[in-house]
Amino acid sequence: MDLSRINTWKSKQLKSFLSSKDTFKADVHGHSALYYAIADNNVRLVCTLLNAGALKNLLENEFPLHQAATLEDTKIVKILLFSGMDDSQFDDKGNTALYYAVDSGNMQTVKLFVKKNWRLMFYGKTGWKTSFYHAVMLNDVSIVSYFLSEIPSTFDLAILLSCIHTTIKNGHVDMMILLLDYMTSTNTNNSLLFIPDIKLAIDNKDIEMLQALFKYDINIYSVNLENVLLDDAEITKMIIEKHVEYKSDSYTKDLDIVKNNKLDEIISKNKELRLMYVNCVKKN
């Protein structure tokens, strides 16, 4: 039996099929009639099959909601959700339907799932399988921006730092700015932002990324300045300029991490660094 052309069947042939014992069986390609109806975005046929009991007779390897989430049109997703399909179900790859909506860049479908349950963006068999992380990996600024706007409270800092790591690693500046804007707006510790992967941006010599990072009050004091100087004077100058900014600012200069750091000692022992520091102070 080949059901791949079921969307072209006449009503008489379809009626005969629906009354047969083969209605919910897999065809020679391993797919059900519902699979082909969704693939063709055939809303009427999907409804007909659902009324016939398709959801109670699903094949083990088919996940209709996940499949429908890849469609640009949201009608079938709405119908399946209304029919009682579980939006938090994982498929055989460990993904939710929202994951596939993100993968396809279907913003309207993404919104449909998130409005129903915003926590879905963090569902996944592992942290790397969540829809939120997937959107970051895809560098989809629009979807991540929407996700962040729908979170009613702050979320796990470890997730955020992991996303920032991926963003810096991939050199996605706009995504990094979006994540740091969110991190800054939710920072209640009255301290500099701790971004462990600033060293990664330095090692990658990603000047554009560093310039964007240094627009925020991030912790620069985990960097070994002497090692950086041997490798890249331009980046060293950026770090010293940020250090001078912190020491001059009425708020940041009183932070313990600014008052008690190793940079001043390192600078004092190096003629080139001292000259760079003095020049930065004069310009500030």
Curated annotation (Swiss-Prot):
It comes from Vaccinia virus (strain Copenhagen) (VACV). It is found in: Host cytoplasm; Host nucleus. Its main location: host cell. GO terms for biological process: symbiont-mediated suppression of host innate immune response; symbiont-mediated suppression of host NF-kappaB cascade. Belongs to the orthopoxvirus OPG039 family. This is Interferon antagonist OPG040. ANK repeats lie at residues 29-58, 60-89, 93-122, 127-157, 159-188, 193-222. The keyword Amino-acid biosynthesis does not apply. Pfam families: Ank_2. GO terms for cellular component: host cell cytoplasm; host cell nucleus. Induction: Expressed in the early phase of the viral replicative cycle. Transmembrane segments: none annotated. Keywords: ANK repeat, Early protein, Host cytoplasm, Host nucleus, Host-virus interaction, Inhibition of host innate immune response by virus, Inhibition of host NF-kappa-B by virus, Repeat, Viral immunoevasion. The keyword Acetylation does not apply. Inhibits antiviral activity induced by type I interferons. Does not block signal transduction of IFN, but is important to counter the host antiviral state induced by a pre-treatment with IFN. PROSITE patterns: ANK_REP_REGION, ANK_REPEAT.
